[in-house]
Amino acid sequence: MALTISRAQYVATYGPTVGDKVRLGDTNLWATIEQDLLTKGDECKFGGGKSVRDGMAQSGTATRDNPNVLDFVITNVMIIDAKLGIIKADIGIRDGRIVGIGQAGNPDTMDNVTPNMIIGASTEVHNGAHLIATAGGIDTHIHFICPQQAQHAIESGVTTLIGGGTGPADGTHATTCTPGAWYMERMFQAAEALPVNVGFFGKGNCSTLDPLREQIEAGALGLKIHEDWGATPAVIDSALKVADEMDIQVAIHTDTLNESGFLEDTMKAIDGRVIHTFHTEGAGGGHAPDIIKAAMYSNVLPASTNPTRPFTKNTIDEHLDMLMVCHHLDKRVPEDVAFADSRIRPETIAAEDILHDMGVFSIMSSDSQAMGRIGEVVIRTWQTADKMKMQRGELGNEGNDNFRIKRYIAKYTINPAIAHGIAEHIGSLEVGKIADIVLWKPMFFGVKPEVVIKKGFISYAKMGDPNASIPTPQPVFYRPMYGAQGLATAQTAVFFVSQAAEKADIRAKFGLHKETIAVKGCRNVGKKDLVHNDVTPNITVDAERYEVRVDGELITCEPVDSVPLGQRYFLF
């Protein structure tokens, strides 16, 4: 005999289902569940008097020798994912990877259990009924200035850091490069202790090929070209030749001063080859005043950095001071002041908001400690999405914000993974990928995760007083969990390296314990492959007024006085 309960009772017990709307933090964004993969009446719920018990939703006979038995299951969770959509399901994990999105349980007593999602005595369970699951974020613009950045990143929901540097040296303060084989080895060894996945850029500024090849052979997953080292056409061509030869990505911070050519000269040097452009609006650096036009090319993978996201009343003033520090400028030198002023343009920053909302800008990143904040990639993404809804209205006619939500979450999950040849392993919650999963309470979505899971093991979480009788008493703050302790750190995070480095077995050569995974497919991607962010309109910039037009239409917006996900979340 079937039991009928009210929708309110169902949601209170098992979480929202198809058609229910969930507000994301204190934004004006509402996510509506599109599909529920669970069987009504057979939902798995752990706890006293609940269903995950021996002989009920937990098999009484299945051992871990059975490859269909899970190590970890997150039940009844709402998933927000650029590839899967906005759905309700159980997430099954085994051997550190996602093996199922569907219905977990005991096939001896339940119908419609997904074949490889058996709950047994070997399975840990986490109730996700009132949580949102997202893929761990990927930040592709890291200045590795201090190792403490990794803690702030993972506490914000970012689980993969890609960039370069050697610590607080001036070269690293300004540029995201780990120069040379010796430093590459040292940085891999240092990053063994970090609880996040890591990939390093070599220095791409060299007009001959062998100095670039040796860095890739030493482990660099890509090359970074930076204007402070000279972003000349010869350098660009050399880096891209080596990239095509060795299947790695090239990231570029172009020539703000137009010393060796203008944007058109840079695009001519790129010559249709795929490239990842950093802070493509230009405040972070790049051809003044029209680097933003690079976003219209099909071979350009355009990214933003978070200090300009979104455009607020304080954005301009803050940038001038940051720029002076990061690029070793002097306010007493007129040429330095002119350099700074040329990079900070309200008109192009305003346009950047809209280009993100249109899907023209495809990736969000931080520019950590070099004008950007490593812990604010996720926050700034959703603040931009909210601002655009308030200023531009809904996208589409769905009666919800699902398309906008999927467009924006793609910017810091799947799209940076595609750009750097690692989408086979991370960037979404699709089956087969590493189980880097972030769980959020809806009221804290985008700001403060509940739990961060790395490779199937809880690594960071909000945790109360360890001496308390239960986990929740104050003070509650982020603490490293067992997945970020001892030898487990090497088992819950990976290094992304070049194929040449993997072939050379740098893991053994450098004495590393973390798994190394080779990037691949970096040279055959284009903007068309970037999820929900593949638009390539014609962009023009007025050289005197800096006005930006898309297909002939002026695009601009007003700065805002306040943003969601802001001060009310950080009172203490």
From Swiss-Prot:
N6-carboxylysine, modified sites: K224
Catalysed reactions listed for this entry: urea + 2 H2O + H(+) = hydrogencarbonate + 2 NH4(+)
Disulphide bond pairs: none
Enzyme class, UniProt record, top EC level: hydrolase
Pathway stated in the Swiss-Prot or TrEMBL entry: Nitrogen metabolism; urea degradation; CO(2) and NH(3) from urea (urease route): step 1/1
A GO biological process held by the record: urea catabolic process
Residues bound to Ni(2+) 1: H141, H143, K224, D367
UniProt keyword annotation of Cytoplasm present: yes
Protein name: Urease subunit alpha
Source organism: Haemophilus influenzae (strain ATCC 51907 / DSM 11121 / KW20 / Rd)
Gene: ureC
